[in-house]
């Protein structure tokens, strides 16, 4: 790189950082397109819409309720990966969708889940909603004319596959109508016998129409018929002060990392700080561009990818130092340092990207949100480390900063004989791992739970209170939360406001009848609340057993995929097995910490485990 090119690269870098800073702070146009304030945030950060449905009929079975909760969760992920669905009482289901303020629009888009039937021309029901495994709108191309066709791709259950094969064989060249709540929404003609459990419904005029029909079919595949009971807009679960403090802490952390890199690596440290600034700006812009929903687990994914971006720079600059110490010129050391570091950086990021891809494809809820933000962060961190950092280091060299002192001097370090002390370290590891069953056993004997499961895992009690005065979320945190904690002894309390009212929703661990009465009396005494304006219902966990199963299966498959990649990459199964064993060791140590400290195990616990 010539001097003029180096100057141009540095100028463009300053311009890029300024442009990213302007975009994230202000954005473009009247709506501030691209700004950080336009990033979708979850219920914990900005609130959203809450819709409660009631099951029609008497005494729905728990199995049907669980199945309906799970399928609704999959349905509302079209709006946000961070949407929550949970059972309330015996026959109600609540859907909470973050980042939305128009409840009517969601109700219109989501529709009212009702009954779905496939009927032949005689009106006989050949399939119903329980036979549908999935439905998606898509586009295909006519093999003859080359024109686009908008279709709905149907996937049937095992029983549905058998029924549909028989129905299509008996109704060739006849219509099978799709009837939703008594209304015919489509009447496709059977063109052939369909025996593989997959079918297409053609004839839609646009992709939007195809997606709408697919949405209706998915909703109609619920086992229960539901009717809307109530809907409202709820506020954030975290106060502005908590969010502000978190942002300040994050900014301070980035600055400290930049300062540390500069102190340790000199000029390359400056490059690392600039690359980190570009990475952060690109991350915020891309969150906007891909319309991702940001929550606390999502932030954990971003923090992990920032750490990986810094790690990549450390690997590169340590290599450059080693090459200079070995007697190579600065120019040669830069070239060799990047070349030698690339394989380690790429391998480390690809294994993490494999895990993110599997978790994103198979997980749901916060696990899926974590995976998507992590995958985005990994791609950006590789780009900034291998492209931006390389350009900047070469640019600084080209403008005349060529002295070895600018690139940090390799210091003599005392070698620690880890292998020689392996018995000591193995002993420490075994003790830490044994603390897992010990800590979980003690906890289980104490309160019947191996870990301190939060609302997301165990469910609890939802108390609706209408206060006499409007209270901000910060007021609720400082005044109401301590009162609730005093009665319940629960540190894991979620409080959210209902928009345009004085109503507040308080979620705690499951409360007995006596505890509910004590809490009601405490709220009456402390805030003068009318006792008739306090209601309480039991709620299920937002992480259903099916979602937990999906997450566990996803983690296992991700682990196997990483094993296979490492085995393929290094041609030795010992490397793969060692990497996974080290990973399991770290997981067990963190699990021991959670078991002994009794820190709440919820979505943040999932994020913490996934960052390992």
PLM features: residue spans?
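A structural signal for conserved, well-ordered secondary-structure elements
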Residues: 1-612
